[in-house]
Amino acid sequence: MTLLFFGSLVLIADPLQSILDAQLSLRPGALLHRLWLSPPLDVYINVYMFNYTNVDEFTAGRAAKLQLQEVGPYVYKEVLSNHNVTYNEPNNTITFVPKREYVFAPERSVGDPKVDRIRAPNIPLMGVTTLASSLSMFAALGLSAIARQLDSQPMLEMSVHDYMWGYEDHLVELASRFVPNWIDFKSFGIMEKLFREGNESNVFNMNLPEPNDKYGARVTDAPRGYTVDSINGERGFKGWDYNEETNGTMCNRIWGSHDATLFPLDMDENDEFFLYRRTFCRRLPVKFNRTTSYNGLDAYEFVMEPDSFDSDVDNTNSSCYCKNKRCLKKGVGSVSPCYYNIPLAITYPHFMHADPSLLEPFEGLQPDEARFTSTFVVQPQLGAPMQGTHLRLQANQVVGKVNFNRMMSPFENMILPLLWVDLNIDVLCLSLRLLIHGIKWGFPLLQWSAALGMLLAGVYQLCSALMLCIWPPTKQFHKVDQVERGTAIQVIGAGLSLATGLRKSSLQLDPEEQLNLLFGGGSIIPKLAKA
């Protein structure tokens, strides 16, 4: 009965689910917590640079279009770790500081970024020129004179590494001295600003999985698990006019988005979520596309919508991106408020899904949905991103109207591609694959096997007991028992007769003969017979 009880208890109580719920949480000591502190994911950023090969011909009027050469990939491994973790029980959140390091992966790269050289836009000069032209004639004239004095050129020739991770610029250095509250750096690198800046100082506050009601159902009005609540105390983008009193709009909120490291375990095909990274300077909507699998692991594939970077003054989901009711062209998303108001923008690579007019000034751009679509793959049992994830976007320099600056006038009202990146996840490590297989198949199979084994053993014991009660031992066994008892009585009687004979006999036995008698010696028997 004990085995039947425990076997039934395993099937009814489902202790495996309770164990998984405890281990797949962010509570200290849990398995997921240990994985989350230092995620064992191989995340890589493939960087493709744009090399401007005919700048002199274009600026001199001898070429109608700029020729772009895509150079790459230069691959960097992103290593994430989470620090300064604090649990906030009253509001069911967790506070932490994510730190990302970028390690060059030469075996995956096309060349050495410190050796390879490109010619690309001078981002500080072009950015400040656009800002000055929008202010006044005197500002534009003054900046033009300073640029000539510093010999700043619209296009720079330098190593790929310096352009990505930082180079000293005289104009930036000058600005850092005169307007330190605005420009607080002396070198500039596009990858440095997009991915590394503020890397160790951003404090995230994230919602833990929502509590259940007394019936075990998810509380509907609670924040979704593993969504961002605030960053550095801000729940929205002030640069996009977030209003704390009204909780903002879908356009300028941060709260409710995911940082792309953890997702709820109860996701399904109807889910839609938002990705946040400072690089985007906005939330990016991601919608379910299909159920798929990688290396035998279940997966949900989500895709970014073609209009993810659009801005429309009449659409509340994107109207905040239109400053003074002026929007950028279709498919171009401004990120200026997050980068010192330098006119930068993000698009899909090669201006895919953007206004076709953006392609007209260039040769060498080829939009390709098969190559440039962004997909996000989530493993539903673990709630983690996995192989097949590709987040692809392009960084661009926005050049507006140029006044009183002859060097910059050839690039007026152009959006110049700088680079595009493919942030992707390589094959999951063996430990994660084993864990996911265990969650889906191994652990449930062990639980069912244990429960079934206990039930079968319990049924066998119960049946055996019932058979003994219904069919007691037969008479044949009683007869055999009587024969065995009779034989024993005869042996005992013979022994008693022998003892009596010894007592009456006058024969004296020496010790050796007594031992022979006890252990079956035959030489003493005749003496006993004569006695």
Predicted regions, residues:
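Extracellular or lumenal secretory-pathway regions
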Residues: 1-298, 305-503, 507-524, 528
